[in-house]
Design a protein with these regions (language model features):
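Soluble non-cytosolic domains of exported or imported proteins
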Residues: 71, 98-102, 117, 200-203, ...
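Short glycine- and hydrophobic/aromatic-rich loop-to-beta-strand nucleating segment
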Residues: 149-150, 291-294, 298-299
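Bacterial N-terminal signal peptides that target proteins for export
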Residues: 2-20
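C-terminal motif of bacterial Sec signal peptides marking the signal peptidase cleavage site
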Residues: 27-30
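Secondary-structure end/capping motifs
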Residues: 300-418
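Conserved C-terminal helix/tail region of periplasmic/extracytoplasmic solute-binding proteins
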Residues: 386-487
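Short, glycine-/small- and polar/acidic-enriched structural segments
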Residues: 39-239, 251-286
Length: 487
């Protein structure tokens, strides 16, 4: 059972908002514990006054509850609340942390949550009926990058001798899984299954961990319709562990490594129990991460509310990245609060402010480890959806070959750039964003992407050719049956 945070708007703040909605051109001079004082601005002061935001008329639903998991990439939700962006859009929001990704998805489907911070694979998997079936859509991508892969100290010590060193003795990065492969083989020979953690079967973390392992010659296993463990033919055995539990599970020896979002890789460094060996930025530069998910029914029944919440989230993402991340220290302070991520300020800052610490003391600049708005991070690209679907097919979650057209059709059912651009256009019209901030002319597909760890090119318009180009994984016409891959 989840406990709602004390994040609903107070009566005073709601009263202030109602005054704005009614007054239009009036400007607040106070809006605190006492009565709000209002005065008409003089011509000399209007140039310095921020635009007054008039909420969209006729919002279908204004009292909303959104869910999240305690990870730093939930930041757009926290900032939209703390900076008053939801409020200014006429939305009275409560934020609730969820126990795990399954609970979060189920509560959105059941209507207990109006929307949530989601794994990008969740709306896609639900819509095609892998796991819980429901039509989920996303009008907003929450971020790029933000994950890492950590191994235990013991595993790191066995990997380390084979890794090339720089002149100062530190390891050369990125570190591929080929340096982990002999360790896995040794453990297997000793009768110790090499267990690793990821956060959910359709998570970016699962696919990134699998991508890294496969690029290094380690088989991460297949799924099949009658075996959803994902461990068919696996050399490394991947299983689900909720993000906040990753460090403790590693420390207990239940797993030897994991892939997770922050701050749970940096937590392992601070606790002295593990070493992050690679970030997802190094696996796939500027990869899409989380999305904001709502049911298709919610979007259809509440189009104005959906536009308003998308506006608020875009504004939050802009704030997080503006002035070369100048607001990140404040964002870290907000996220460190118990009602959000609840980790120490220093742990969150270690990755959120443009650095990343690998081995203890080996802190390196990674300015784009977390990206919330730059590089069109918030635009829901169809090609991002296609990549996730390609990985579901690669590992057998999509059991049979599908046409390239099928991938495009699913992407268009789930990813809603039309909603996003409508919200963005209104922000530009209101003077809250610049025309140049948004990709107005895109067809929803990024150009072919080349910056992967294994130098394979991904073209979202040709998913089957991409899948067939990958060394380990299912190819066209192949299925997994009875623990074997057949044509």
């Amino acid at each position: 059972m989840t406990t709602p945070l004390a994040l609903g708007l107070s009566g005073i703040r709601r009263s202030c908002l109602n005054t704005v909605m009614a007054a239009g051109l009036l400007v607040f001079t106070a809006c605190g514990g006492g009565e709000p004082a209002l005065e008409t601005p003089s011509p000399e002061t209007t140039a310095d006054v921020a635009p007054v935001i008039i909420p969209i008329e006729g919002l279908e639903k204004t009292d909303l509850t959104f869910g999240f998991i305690k990870l730093t990439d939930m930041a757009p939700l926290a900032i939209a609340y703390e900076k008053g962006y939801f409020e200014e859009e006429g939305l009275f929001v409560t934020l609730e942390p969820q126990a795990n990704w399954k609970v979060l998805l189920d509560r959105v489907i059941d209507g207990e949550l109006d929307g949530a911070h989601m794994l990008a694979g969740q709306p896609l998997a639900a819509t095609i009926g892998y796991g819980t079936e429901a039509h989920i859509v996303t009008p907003f991508s929450m971020d790029l990058n933000g994950n890492g892969i950590t191994v235990s100290n013991e595993v790191w010590e066995e990997m380390k001798p084979g890794i090339p060193k720089m002149d100062d003795g530190r390891p050369v990065h990125p570190i591929g899984a080929e340096y982990l492969k002999p360790v896995i083989e040794k453990y297997t020979e000793e009768g110790k299954p090499f267990n690793m953690g990821m956060v959910f079967p359709v998570s970016t973390h699962n696919y990134e961990l699998r991508y890294w392992l496969a690029a290094g010659g380690v088989h991460p296993g297949f799924y099949s319709p009658d075996d959803v463990s994902g461990q068919i033919q696996a050399e490394a055995l991947l299983s689900v562990t909720p993000p906040p539990q990753m460090p403790a599970t590693l420390e207990a020896g239940t797993i030897y490594g994991y892939c997770v979002g922050e701050p749970w890789n940096q937590q392992a460094v601070f606790k002295g129990i593990g070493v992050p060996v690679i970030t997802d930025y190094e696996i796939w530069k500027d990869n899409p991460e989380k999305v904001f998910g709502i049911t298709a029914e919610f979007a259809e029944e509440n189009p104005k509310t959906t536009k308003a919440l998308t506006r608020a989230l875009i504004r939050a993402a802009m704030w997080l990245d503006e002035n070369e991340n100048a607001n990140r220290p404040e964002a870290v302070e907000i996220l460190s609060r118990s009602e959000y991520v609840g980790a120490d300020y220093e742990v969150i800052a270690n990755s959120m402010t443009g650095t990343f610490e690998y081995e203890k003391g080996d802190k390196r600049p990674v300015p784009d480890f977390n990206v919330f708005f730059r590089y069109n991070a918030t635009y829901p690209y169809y090609s991002d959806a296609v990549w996730y679907l390609s990985q579901m097919r690669r590992w057998g979650q999509i059991s049979e070959t599908q046409t390239d057209e099928w991938y495009d059709e699913v992407a268009r059912r789930v990813y809603r750039p039309d909603i996003y651009l409508d919200a963005a256009r209104s922000l530009v019209d209101d003077g809250l964003a610049s025309e140049a901030d948004f990709p107005w002319d895109t067809d929803g597909y990024r150009p072919p992407q080349t910056e992967f760890l294994d130098d394979v090119t991904f073209d979202g318009r040709a998913p089957n050719a991409y899948i067939d180009s990958l060394t380990i994984g299912l190819k066209s016409g192949e299925i997994v049956s009875g623990g074997e891959v057949t044509n």
